[in-house]
């Protein structure tokens, strides 16, 4: 049987849009989690006609989302095999890597042992050491930082260590140097931090403003991803939103920054007017950062409905030689206890122009099936995990 190949693959990761607890959810403290289901309940039904038309309620029934007779997309559900439930783990697995050692998160701040090592390395004291919003923590500790020169260290629900400092108190070059040293320290398996972020700010007397001189010191993926294979074979690999940061630029031919989900979707639509051969890959982070961690189911629901409206433009622009894949990287149920991600299945929707009636792609045993399918499509080396579903399209 002839396999249809596509010139362009558009991959949308709806950050944290899980679709029900994974079989191993109990091990993560996530029994009963269902990001989409619980948001729909709190919203008294989600209004997402475009996702409904693609077949979302064929994966799992979601309140308010009609189960259409003939879905316009193929649909399935994916289970993560890697041992974490964070953004990097989910995305790296999508592109073909199996993460056996999870990145660590620090909901109660960093261990004193690490803080002492940072003090020794830098000769500076430390303020904060807690989970915080970047704008809130400089509001709270900015004055003390300026007085003492101590570093403001904080984290989030993700595997990150962020260091905020006033540009006139800790010059940029010094801050970057500190972050590089901390990056080296935190490669130790007992810390295993995904990203170190320099967060410079300016201002005076409590009126602080973060500058655009932020710098991320990520981990490079420990193996080759499908994006590396595409780039090396001469295909385009366009990263929209925080995709380039997640893979530390590996396998990226063009990086497009975004400031919000709306902005990301607009930039995705614009990228569809470009002539290219390869992958256009976007992460929509607001679902996770603005609503999931903040346990705001109504805000999350409204953001999903807004995404659905913008999705109509994407679907309309899909040409004969294009394929659109929509999925997620983990869950973040905004009615679940705590503020962390949740271990869940993720939805899979695959749309091409020629589908008369979408079929069930079944349970995919790893997120890497997406990467394997993309590799198969462009006939580059397949990842060591994952099964292509290209022939089913």
Swiss-Prot record:
Keywords: Cytoplasm, Isomerase, Manganese, Metal-binding. Mn(2+) 2 binds at residues 288, 293, 341. One of its GO terms (cellular component) is cytosol. Pathway: Carbohydrate degradation; 2-deoxy-D-ribose 1-phosphate degradation; D-glyceraldehyde 3-phosphate and acetaldehyde from 2-deoxy-alpha-D-ribose 1-phosphate: step 1/2. Its EC number is 5.4.2.7. Its main location: cytoplasm. It is found in: Cytoplasm. CDD domains: PPM. GO terms for molecular function: magnesium ion binding; manganese ion binding; phosphopentomutase activity. It catalyses: 2-deoxy-alpha-D-ribose 1-phosphate = 2-deoxy-D-ribose 5-phosphate; alpha-D-ribose 1-phosphate = D-ribose 5-phosphate. Mn(2+) 1 binds at residues 15, 329-330. Binds 2 manganese ions. Its cofactor is Mn(2+). Isomerase that catalyzes the conversion of deoxy-ribose 1-phosphate (dRib-1-P) and ribose 1-phosphate (Rib-1-P) to deoxy-ribose 5-phosphate (dRib-5-P) and ribose 5-phosphate (Rib-5-P), respectively. NCBIfam families: deoB, PRK05362.1. Belongs to the phosphopentomutase family. PANTHER family: PHOSPHOPENTOMUTASE (PTHR21110:SF0). This is Phosphopentomutase. It comes from Halalkalibacterium halodurans (strain ATCC BAA-125 / DSM 18197 / FERM 7344 / JCM 9153 / C-125).
């Amino acid at each position: 049987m002839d396999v249809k190949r596509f010139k362009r693959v558009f991959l949308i990761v709806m950050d944290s849009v899980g679709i029900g607890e994974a079989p191993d959810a109990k091990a993560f403290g996530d029994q009963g989690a269902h990001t989409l289901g619980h948001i729909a309940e709190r919203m008294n039904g989600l209004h997402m006609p475009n996702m409904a038309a693609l077949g979302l309620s064929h994966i799992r029934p979601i309140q308010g989302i009609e189960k259409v007779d003939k879905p316009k997309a193929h649909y399935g559900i994916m289970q993560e095999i890697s041992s974490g439930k964070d953004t990097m783990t989910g995305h790296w697995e999508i592109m073909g890597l199996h993460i056996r050692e999870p990145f660590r998160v620090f909901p109660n701040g960093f261990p004193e042992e690490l803080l002492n090592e940072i003090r020794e390395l830098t000769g500076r004291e430390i303020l904060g050491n807690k989970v915080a919003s970047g704008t809130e923590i400089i509001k709270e500790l900015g004055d003390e930082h300026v007085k003492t020169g101590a570093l403001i260290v904080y984290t989030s629900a993700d595997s990150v260590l962020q260091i905020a400092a006033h540009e006139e108190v800790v010059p940029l070059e010094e801050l970057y140097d500190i972050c590089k040293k901390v990056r080296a320290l935190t490669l130790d398996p007992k810390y295993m931090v995904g990203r170190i972020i320099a967060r410079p700010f300016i201002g005076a007397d409590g009126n602080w403003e973060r500058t655009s001189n932020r710098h991320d010191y990520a981990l490079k993926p420990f193996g080759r991803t499908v994006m590396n294979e595409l780039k090396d074979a001469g295909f385009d690999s366009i990263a929209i939103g925080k995709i380039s940061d997640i893979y530390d630029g590996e396998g990226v031919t063009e990086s497009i920054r975004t400031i919000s989900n709306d902005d990301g979707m607009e930039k995705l639509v614009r990228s569809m007017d470009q002539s290219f051969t390869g992958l256009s890959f976007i992460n929509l982070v607001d679902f996770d950062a603005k609503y999931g961690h903040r346990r705001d189911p109504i805000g999350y629901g409204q953001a999903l409905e807004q995404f659905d409206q913008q999705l109509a433009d994407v679907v309309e622009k899909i040409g004969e030689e294009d394929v659109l894949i929509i999925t997620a990287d983990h869950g973040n149920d905004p009615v679940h206890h705590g503020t962390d991600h949740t271990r869940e299945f993720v939805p899979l929707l695959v749309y091409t122009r020629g589908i008369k009636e979408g079929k069930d792609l079944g349970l995919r045993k790893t997120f890497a099936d997406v990467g394997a399918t993309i590799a198969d499509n462009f006939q580059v080396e397949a990842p060591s995990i994952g099964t292509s579903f290209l022939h089913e399209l």
